[in-house]
Structures are given as C-alpha cells and as structure tokens.
Amino acid sequence: MGPPLPLLLLLLLLLPPRVLPAAPSSVPRGRQLPGRLGCLLEEGLCGASEACVNDGVFGRCQKVPAMDFYRYEVSPVALQRLRVALQKLSGTGFTWQDDYTQYVMDQELADLPKTYLRRPEASSPARPSKHSVGSERRYSREGGAALANALRRHLPFLEALSQAPASDVLARTHTAQDRPPAEGDDRFSESILTYVAHTSALTYPPGSRTQLREDLLPRTLGQLQPDELSPKVDSGVDRHHLMAALSAYAAQRPPAPPGEGSLEPQYLLRAPSRMPRPLLAPAAPQKWPSPLGDSEDPSSTGDGARIHTLLKDLQRQPAEVRGLSGLELDGMAELMAGLMQGVDHGVARGSPGRAALGESGEQADGPKATLRGDSFPDDGVQDDDDRLYQEVHRLSATLGGLLQDHGSRLLPGALPFARPLDMERKKSEHPESSLSSEEETAGVENVKSQTYSKDLLGQQPHSEPGAAAFGELQNQMPGPSKEEQSLPAGAQEALSDGLQLEVQPSEEEARGYIVTDRDPLRPEEGRRLVEDVARLLQVPSSAFADVEVLGPAVTFKVSANVQNVTTEDVEKATVDNKDKLEETSGLKILQTGVGSKSKLKFLPPQAEQEDSTKFIALTLVSLACILGVLLASGLIYCLRHSSQHRLKEKLSGLGGDPGADATAAYQELCRQRMATRPPDRPEGPHTSRISSVSSQFSDGPIPSPSARSSASSWSEEPVQSNMDISTGHMILSYMEDHLKNKNRLEKEWEALCAYQAEPNSSFVAQREENVPKNRSLAVLTYDHSRVLLKAENSHSHSDYINASPIMDHDPRNPAYIATQGPLPATVADFWQMVWESGCVVIVMLTPLAENGVRQCYHYWPDEGSNLYHIYEVNLVSEHIWCEDFLVRSFYLKNLQTNETRTVTQFHFLSWYDRGVPSSSRSLLDFRRKVNKCYRGRSCPIIVHCSDGAGRSGTYVLIDMVLNKMAKGAKEIDIAATLEHLRDQRPGMVQTKEQFEFALTAVAEEVNAILKALPQ
C-alpha cells in the first residue's frame, strides 16, 4: 500500500511546481530496499545483511561485504538544494522510511560528483575485535534507547532548527499526528533530518586553528559569544547545551577495530576522500581528577566519570554553553573524543595497557581530588561508564561522520592533518607494537585519536574539582605541541603523507564498463544492457553486482559464479557480439573495457562527435575561404593581365612591321611613360619640352589604362607670376570698377558689337565643297586667318577646315587654334590638323549634346582604338577630376610614317551654348590643369566648343589676359584684347554675360595671385 490518499493530496497542495520530482510507484512502508539513504541519521533502514556505508552525506545501505566506497563532493549550492529538499520532505511528514523520500534524495544526489575510495584488501586478515558482533548489536540496541532518552528533552531545540514556513510545520504536525509511527520511526530521526538540513549549510569565517585557540583560552565559557554565522533560533531554546553534547559525541571514534565484515561509518573513514580535520595535542599536559574510591585504574573510571560530570554540567549551565560557537564546540568534541579513547584503553587493557602506551606512572602518584556532591557514587561509576560508552557509541554510528565531515568541509580555514611527532618515535621504541591488531586495522583517524589519548591520560589534575569542569575544559582545548610548532610545514606534510601511506588500503576491484552513444544513459537502459550481456553469456543477472550508470557508460562488477565468468570474459564477449547487443538494446556501443572505477573517465560520445563535426565544419569553411580568396585573386590578376595584353596588342598593331626600329622605340617609350612618376618640384616656365604623359599630372594620381577616378584640385595654388603688388592692385581696381559700373560695361559691350574686323573676307569657307564642313554659317574662317591642311594627306584632297589660328605676341607662332566641334565628315580633318600643327593639348568646352541637340561629334574612341583615314587614335586613360571636367589621354599614330604622339584632352562639361559656367572657380581650376600640362611647350592649344566662337573665345580671352599679367604686363585692356581676337576669328565672345564672366574670372584670379604673393 502506498501513502494514504489525504497525505498525497496534501503533498500536491503544499509542494510548489517542479520542486520535487513525482513520486515513483511506492511499496509498503517499512520494506527495506537495497541502497537506501539516511542510515547515518536513522537506524533500522538497513537490512540484516546490509551495512551502513558513509558516503559523506546521509549514509547508504550496501550488502555485506560492501565493495563500493565513495564520497559525494558537495558544493555550497548543492548543500542549499539538499537543505531545501529536506525541509520540504520533513515539513510534509515524510521520513527516511518513506520510499518517496528515498526516491527524491536519490535524484538529488545523482548529479553530485563522487570520489571513489580505495577499499580494504580482501586478503588482509582481520584481527578479532574486543567486542563480538553480538556485543556490538547489544551496544547498538541499548545505546539507541539510552541516546533517545538522553536527547528526547532536547526535541524543542531540534524542532526550532527547522526554519520551514509555518504552513509547512503545521502540515507536518497534522500529518505526523494522523498516522501511527512506523517501526523505527521516531521524532528523533525526523529532528536529526531537519538538523542536518540546516547545519550542512553552515559556514565559518576563515582563520587558522591556532588563532582560534589563542582567542579561546583567555576567556571563560560564560564570556563566549555566539558565532555570527551560526543558525539563529529562539532565545528560549537551549541550543548550545545540546550542541556541546552532540559535538562531543560526534568527535568520538570507537577504540577497538571492527570485526571482519563490519562496515560501520566510523570504520569506513579509514580511507577518507579528503584530509581529516586537524587534531592537535594540548600545549601543556594536565591531569584530570579521579573520583573517590577508585585508585586502581583511573583511566577506566576517573575519565569516564569526568566526562559524565561534564555532560551533567552542560545540562545545569545552559547559559554558559549558549555562548559557544561552532568552532568552539568542535574543540570540545575533539577533547572529549580523546578522553573517551583513554577510557576505552583503560577498560580494555588496564594498567599494563597504560604502561605499554609509554606512561611512566606519574598519574598514579598525582593528587586525587574529589567531585562535588552531584557526582556519581563510587559503586555506580562503572555502570555509568558503560552507559556513557553506549551513548557515545550510538551517536558516533549515527551522527559522527556526518557532523564532523560536514564541518571539516565547510571550514575554510581548516588545516591539513598533522601527524604527531612522537608517533614514529613510539613505534621505533616498541617494535612489537607494530604487529598488533590495533595497528594492522587502524585507520588514519584511529591512529590520530590513539596517539593523543596518551597525552590526555598524562595530564595534571586541575586545582578546582567538580564545579570547575568548564574551566578545565576551556584550559584543555587542543593546542599545538611545541614539537609541532617548531617543525616546518614541509616536514609536517611529509610526515602526514608517510603516515597515510602506511594505512592506505589496496586498489579497489576492477570494474567492467560499456560506453554507449547516449549521454546521459538512463539507469533502466543500463540495467537492460547488462541483462542482455548476462543472457548472452548464459549467466544469471545476479552475477553482475553494483551496476551503475556514469554518463554514457554503464559499469558493473562480476561476482563469483558457477561458470567462472570474469570481467575480462564479459568485455571480450561484448566486443565479439557487439552487433547483436546493439540490435537487442537499441544502443550503439562505442567502447568497452576493464579498469578501476576511480580512474574511469569517459569521453561523452556526443561531445566527441560534436567536436569532430565542428572541426570538420571549420576545416571546410576555412578551405572555402582560402579557395574564394585564391579565385578572387586569380580573377583580378586575369582581368588586369587581359587588359594589359589587349593594350599591348593594340600598341603593337600601330606599326606595320613589328621588327622595325620605330615600333621598338615606340614600345619602349610606352613602358617608360607608364612607369615614370612626375618630379616633385614644379617645372619652370622655360624648361624643355617633356613628352611624358605622367609629367602632365604631377599633382594627381598616375593614370592607368582604362582607369577612371575623381579628384578635386582647387586647393592647388595659382601659377606663380611676375606681377608685382602695385600692378595687381591697380588691375584689380580696374576690374572691380568695370563690374560695379554697369553703364561703363554696357558701353564697352556695345562698342565691341559694332566693331568690324579688317580684312574680313570668307570666300574659301563659302565655297560649295566647303559649306558642308561648317557647323554654323555665322562663324566662318577669314581667308587671311585659317588653318591650311596638306591636301595630299587629306581624305578629301582639300586644305580647308573651320579652324582659325589665334596669335598673341608672336605672329609666327600661334598660341591657340580656335575651331568648331568636329562633324562626322570632318573627324579625319580634325586629327590631321592635330597632327600637322603639332598639338598635344585639346581643350573641349562643350558637352556632346545639349537638350537633344548635337553639339559635337564623338571624335575619340571610348575604348581601344579607332582609325580616322591614316591616323589611328588609341584611348589610354580617362580621369574624372571633378564634376565639371575630366581628362583623357590618347596615343595618335600616323600610319604613313609610323610616328606616334601623346595627345591630352581636357573636357569641360558644365558650360552650355551661349551661357556661362555656374562658377568661375571651376573654370579657373580647369585652366590651371590645362596650363600645367602645356607648360614649356611651343605648340598651339586647340580650343573648341560647338561653333568655336562663343565659349572658345571667352576661354581664350581669360587665358590670354591672365598670361599677360603673369608675364608682368603693366596695363591690361580686356576690351582691346577681345577686339584682337575678333580680328582673327569672327564671333569670339558672343554675349555680354560671357564678357562680364571673363572680367569676373580675371578679377578673381588676380585676387588669388595677390594673396599668394609675399606681403
């Protein structure tokens, strides 16, 4: 039968969601299941064939002989979780007897890490114990009743430790009253459950034990203050009264070794998973007073009576005990443990035993003080000692390991175990004692307690008997001996290691394991897999003992069986029948083997597969990235190489004979021009002519074939001139006067419109064969001022082209050639004019079309080269310098002579027909670029727009006036200069706005020149 229905309903109402897992299918209460938890806290949990194994938390029942020893490593977070779970279970009425409690706490402990201990060697002979198994059981039964009676009056304190909410406590009280107590179920066990839940989370401030003793000794017990981190309970509860007694009981270790097969918790502590708490000898040996009438064996009766007296004083003086802290209670417990060790030696050995322990008999000669009136009578001392031993033995078996181990783990200032110095000396002085049963079976804790019991037995009696028990207890708090204080820390550690090595048990039994691909593996799946292996080997499933699931693996031990199957046989059979086992179990077996459980470390297969998958994915991504970079680099290289290859082919095709000297010289010139950077310093006004294209753009990036870029160059300083400051200011005043005086500007423009050039005949331009070559009949070349082509080289065998040379100061060498934008029929004539006049700079001041009206024919190739009659034009580069203009470079080749020339075109984009640019600054910047390219050349500059008069005339006027000022002219007459231009080509500067723009541009440039001059 499971728990009653009202209890389950109350549990569902009280428990919050997901705090405790659902209870499994229950069995009748009181049924002793294997592996039950809580045997350290409550008796009656383990069966007759089971022993309580100390797992460092609650204790676990295991079948005898117990083979699986481990300790849980409990973190502060895990302790808090266990405390909450215990509070809720205790508050709802569950005890350790309930299967639901077992299930919940087993689930809570399943995720805690374990440290596996080395079990005692099975072959090592066990010496017979001083107490038989029957006497041990008798002590256990009698001690349980005595301890229950002794501690039942302290139940208010234990209940006060449970800090559960009022609702939980009320529910627990009603539930406990409603149901009858089961066998082995008492309030003491439940109270201890609550007590452990609270005290396991205690923490103490860090500090050395030496500092604690120094602070403790000068004070009396009545002056002690409660620890700050101790649990807070009601002031009316005698908390420290019970705590002192429990701590004294908890520190006790049984004096005699257990019999064979005994696996009580105090004996399992021989192979600790961590260093035990330090127990140091008192600083000064003292003796305890003996009761009257017992001079024969003071160790057997006097110490026991004194311990009993101390316990009674703890009852009578709760006010003094209430000030004790956790660390001080631990000290009292250790002291009483040593006294109890001495009592046991006196009972077991008598005076000879005391002599064997190295005593000189000085205790018998010391004074014997009497106890106060509340001491026990002489004839009842031995019985009281028996009862006292039963109480201590009972409490040691239930609470000793838990309280002391938890306290040790939670003390941050705890020191490693220090081996007493006189132990090695006593062993060497008494070699026969090394073969005794006590040393053969003694653990680390027993060696420690026995050693210090000798020092406690040799203490001097205190001056005050009976009533001064608390003063004696305070003065006898354990302290470091002089030998230990003088010993270096390294030597202490070395001695401690040596002592532990002497008592370490043998390696634990090898275990078989099977690693699967499922992480975590469920316990039922692991058991089913082991059962499949058992059926495969035709052995009973009971041959596989201690089946446990660790992550993705199931571990087991093979016990003795009729078929003599060993763990190695199981491993071999698993490997040979891997496919069959995988088919029956539905699991994939990754690994099998045999090894020590403490050394088994399984790599989760999923993590391994995930790591492998991640590694493969990262490798593929890296390879893809590298491949992408290589492909991109190769593509860029191929594109650039292809472009260069096409350019070389075009350049090589300019010559008819690849082997000719002219072609080789031309190719070498091209390579030099593409590789040479311009000089850093500006060229002088009279330097030699340079034919390198790169030198034309010394203030900008080097052009590359078919490259397009943009840059602004307005920050460039104006060209240096020879104009002095006075002349500049005079010219600037003249310009400003013209611009401000609108009437004067109007009169000058009217005079210019009425001006007629002499001579002004245009008969050649008006011939019938030449009329189609004119874009506008309003702008025809004068007969005396026109460019003559070589008729023998012309495709039309004519010397006419609508272009006029513009002379400046030298009538033999024109500075400009003003011409119209080429027509489709005159493109060859245009390139012939460029070639024959030796021009290297073309200034284009019009877009190709305006509002759908063609302004100029596209007379250059967009890419590659075009052939115009005998002239091949190859586009080398095109640079967009700003929004207003761009620059193109051409290679011009005469196919008749195989000669080549570099021609640069400056194309201004934002100047429309019969209009002006939006800003004079952009045109002045454009002019600087043109002059920088042209500087040092003697050939004319070809300037054209649509008709070759309005915009071309304005540009030529501005450039001519500024060049004169740069050469140091003292007087400037812009109107006269314009009349000079119109004498050579009609219609130059077509509108008044264009004339006014010319004045503004000149004034702005003069102002810039004046700013650049040194003041």
Curated annotation (Swiss-Prot):
Primary location group: membrane
Modification type N6-acetyllysine: residues: K970
Disease note: Autoantigen in insulin-dependent diabetes mellitus (IDDM).
Top-level class of the enzyme under EC nomenclature: hydrolase
Record-level Gene Ontology MF annotations: transmembrane receptor protein tyrosine phosphatase activity
Effect of substituting C945A: No effect to increase invasion, migration, and metastatic lung colonization in mice breast cancer model
Positions with biased composition (Basic and acidic residues): 421-432
Signal peptide stretch: 1-21
Binding of substrate, residues: D913, C945, S946, D947, G948, A949, G950, R951, Q990
Modified residues (Phosphoserine): S436, S437, S692, S698
An annotated GO BP: protein dephosphorylation
Superkingdom of the source species: Eukaryota
This protein's UniProt keywords: Acetylation, Cytoplasmic vesicle, Diabetes mellitus, Glycoprotein, Hydrolase, Lipid metabolism, Membrane, Phospholipid metabolism, Phosphoprotein, Protein phosphatase, Receptor, Signal, Synapse, Transmembrane, Transmembrane helix
UniProt function note: Plays a role in vesicle-mediated secretory processes. Required for normal accumulation of secretory vesicles in hippocampus, pituitary and pancreatic islets. Required for the accumulation of normal levels of insulin-containing vesicles and preventing their degradation. Plays a role in insulin secretion in response to glucose stimuli. Required for normal accumulation of the neurotransmitters norepinephrine, dopamine and serotonin in the brain.
Residue ranges, annotated region (Involved in localization to secretory granules): 1-421
Designated name of the protein: Receptor-type tyrosine-protein phosphatase N2
Side Cytoplasmic, residues: 637-1015
Positions of the catalytic residues: C945 (phosphocysteine intermediate)
Residues glycosylated per entry: N564
Keyword flag NAD: no
pH dependence of activity: Optimum pH is 4.5.
PROSITE patterns (UniProt xref): TYR_PHOSPHATASE_1, TYR_PHOSPHATASE_2, TYR_PHOSPHATASE_PTP
Stored Gene3D superfamilies: Protein tyrosine phosphatase superfamily (3.90.190.10), Protein-tyrosine phosphatase receptor IA-2 ectodomain (3.30.70.2470)
